């Protein structure tokens, strides 16, 4: 039986490939407005603090490659071909769709490397992909909208949290707080009934219950530099408040809204949150990110096949 050929569009935020890319990358995020010199320097300093340009670009490539390979191994009806489409740097989402079209792909499935749906992120990625496909004609894209509740994905984090708690000294384990977080978005998304905040709360509940952790809280991180109010509480403020209320000896951070080691995790968690835990005299823990680990790739493959009714 011959296999059907299908495009696998893997979308992500994107990251600079080298230091010279930082300004144009930041300008794209700011919708064509160049950043002020001090804003640009601040971003460069953050990258410098994590040891240079974030590994995200390489990790995204590995995730897409491994997902293609795994999908082609676990079923025999479809041959998937992966294409990477990024929001803020090349290859842009439109570039990936054009590449699929050029390769004669007529059907594709898309997945965003962000587990929770929001109008601000996932919906805009899928919209860009579908608009480009319609413009070119002859290409239909089926889009995954969210996958935070995929049992295999939840299990990935449950296992990491259990390992982290098992590694703690007993006195810390009995006095630890789990903080589950995602990228903050402007508060106005709530006016449109955006499910994003509820999905993060559901994620936190699934992970905490699965790991047998009763002391947990939900926080937001990495908010943008705009005058609008953003979803809170911020993880750093939350850490201080929880410490003042209960005097926790250890904080465990699970940035479940992210799937890879990049600036938001390596700087906003591993540096900024650790500054807070050091200041209050508590221990800092942050389990390993999914990156391209086999159990995470298997979770994504399961999500894709379920979306296609297989």
From Swiss-Prot:
One of its GO terms (molecular function) is metal ion binding. Optimum pH is 7.2 with Zn(2+) and protoporphyrin IX as substrates. Changing residue 264 to V: Retains less than 1% of activity. Pathway: Porphyrin-containing compound metabolism; protoheme biosynthesis. It is an enzyme of class 4 (lyase). Fe(2+) binds at residues 183, 264. Changing residue 272 to S: Abolishes the effect of Mg(2+). One of its GO terms (biological process) is heme biosynthetic process. It catalyses: Fe-coproporphyrin III + 2 H(+) = coproporphyrin III + Fe(2+). It is found in: Cytoplasm. The keyword Membrane does not apply. Mg(2+) binds at residues 20, 46, 268, 272. Disruption phenotype: Deletion mutant requires hemin for growth. Its EC number is 4.99.1.9. Keywords: Cytoplasm, Heme biosynthesis, Iron, Lyase, Magnesium, Metal-binding, Porphyrin biosynthesis. Fe-coproporphyrin III binds at residues 13, 30, 46-47, 54, 125. Transmembrane segments: none annotated. PROSITE patterns: FERROCHELATASE. Monomer. Interacts with frataxin/Fra. Belongs to the ferrochelatase family. Involved in coproporphyrin-dependent heme b biosynthesis. Catalyzes the insertion of ferrous iron into coproporphyrin III to form Fe-coproporphyrin III. It can also insert iron into protoporphyrin IX. Has weaker activity with 2,4 disulfonate, deuteroporphyrin and 2,4 hydroxyethyl. In vitro, can also use Zn(2+) or Cu(2+). This is Coproporphyrin III ferrochelatase.
